[in-house]
Amino acid sequence: HPSLAGWYITEEFHDGSYPVGWQQEPALSMLANYLQTVAAYVKSKSPKEVCIAPALWRGMPADLCGKWFGKIFAQTPDIDVLYLQDIGGRCLVDFDVDLPNWFAEIKKACDANGVIFGVDIESFKECWCPRITMRTKPWTELEEQLRVAGMFTDHITNFSWATFKPGTDTYEGYKKYLEGK
């Protein structure tokens, strides 16, 4: 299947400053150098697309976050695809307000550097304030995430380790939801 034809650098990083952060030099260039070294190496083995999937913590304003990604991509010519984790399962995210602002700025950085912009939606829900333990997310919320991501890209994937497994009624639940619309 075409979606499995390529390389994925698994180390997850984010735009926040916890615990240390990659926002400033020399950490930013150290991260970019690592990503470029790995991407160039795997492409030397097989010249397929290289994908990364960092998390969007919204650790800086959207415009600065876009510039930050631009600085990384300027140093990583062998990175082909970004699947940005939307952090939509972590609460305190307004899909209609927060995500479009960050998606637009990060997509600009991708476009300027020849990187495909994609979104990795979180289809689970787990929050620390208010405390919500890991669970499936309502289909209306998932549909909203897909709609917002679809405003910026056709490259959308799903991240969830708890909600798409046998016994959670995910497939049948979604099918019923769509039939009822």
Regions found by a protein language model. Give the residues of each.
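Glycan-processing catalytic domains of CAZymes
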Residues: 1-181
